């Protein structure tokens, strides 16, 4: 708990058995009240590792629902548990849990209702092992998205996010895609609803065990991001109604 607000960390997992313990051990339990681990039918020992670590809230999908579908389960459970602040952290150890207090503080003190852990903010992305092609693609996509969505974010593609309860109760994230594009749809929804988005610089860590989507899926994801941004702008101009927005 921080400033009297309950903090729940959600871990959307897919074959995270090799990195889950390292991630979990760094979670600051002096402020984190609950952890929810959702295994998206990955087929490895993620749930067994979670049980050995003492994670109380373990959920396994009977079939693979996709990255977005996993997040939907995570957020529903966090809200059910009475979370005031929900922090989504990938259990592949690409993002350091040590930033949870900073992100939670920004939400708890009403400075920002949405906070992103940005790998691009600062100069550590390439030093941390982010492939050059992904770095360039990230920068180009973010530039285009900032233009269409009228923001100045350093990246939209991080898997490290904090939301206030009000945010998740105000937008229709349940209507979003079950795929990777969920992340960009929920950002567009947050902006459309008038929620300010803050960022903290997060060290980049790419290594063999960390999860990553392949080139084909990355291309599909990139096109999807552009589609979300264009639909957002057309919606704001009143030209074409985007059903995910109000």
Predicted regions and their residues:
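Acceptor/aglycone-binding surface of glycosyltransferases and processive sugar-polymer synthases
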Residues: 61-63, 67-80, 97-180, 207-226
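Short beta-strand-to-loop acidic/aromatic patch adjacent to the donor-nucleotide binding site
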Residues: 83-92
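Short, well-formed alpha-helical segments that are part of the catalytic scaffolds
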Residues: 14-29
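Donor nucleotide-sugar binding loop of glycosyltransferases
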Residues: 16-19, 42, 96
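Hydrophobic helical membrane-anchoring modules
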Residues: 1-3, 150, 174-246
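A short, conserved beta-strand element in the Rossmann-like catalytic core
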Residues: 41, 66, 94
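A conserved acidic beta->alpha catalytic loop
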Residues: 39-47
């Amino acid at each position: 708990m921080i400033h009297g607000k309950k903090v729940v960390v959600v871990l959307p997992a897919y074959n995270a058995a090799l990195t889950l313990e390292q991630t979990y051990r760094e979670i600051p339990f002096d402020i984190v009240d609950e952890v929810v681990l959702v295994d998206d039918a990955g087929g490895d020992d993620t749930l067994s590792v979670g049980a050995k670590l003492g994670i109380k809230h373990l959920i396994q999908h009977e079939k693979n629902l996709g990255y977005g579908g996993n997040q939907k389960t995570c957020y529903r459970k966090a809200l059910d548990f009475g979370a005031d602040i929900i922090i989504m952290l990938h259990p592949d150890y690409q993002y350091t849990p040590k930033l949870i207090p900073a992100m939670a503080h920004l939400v708890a003190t009403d400075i920002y209702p949405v906070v992103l852990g940005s790998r691009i903010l600062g100069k550590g992305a390439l030093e941390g092992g982010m492939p050059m092609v992904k770095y360039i693609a990230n920068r180009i996509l973010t530039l285009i998205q900032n233009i269409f969505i009228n923001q100045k974010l350093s990246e939209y593609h991080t898997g490290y996010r904090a939301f206030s309860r009000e945010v998740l109760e105000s937008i229709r994230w349940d209507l979003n895609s079950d795929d990777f594009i969920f992340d960009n749809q929920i950002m567009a929804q947050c902006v459309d609803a008038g929620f300010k988005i803050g960022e903290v610089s997060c060290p980049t860590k790419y290594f063999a065990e960390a999860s990553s989507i392949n080139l084909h899926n990355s291309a599909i994801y990139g096109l999807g991001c552009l589609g979300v941004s264009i639909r957002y702008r057309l919606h704001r101009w009143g030209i074409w109604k985007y059903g995910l927005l109000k």
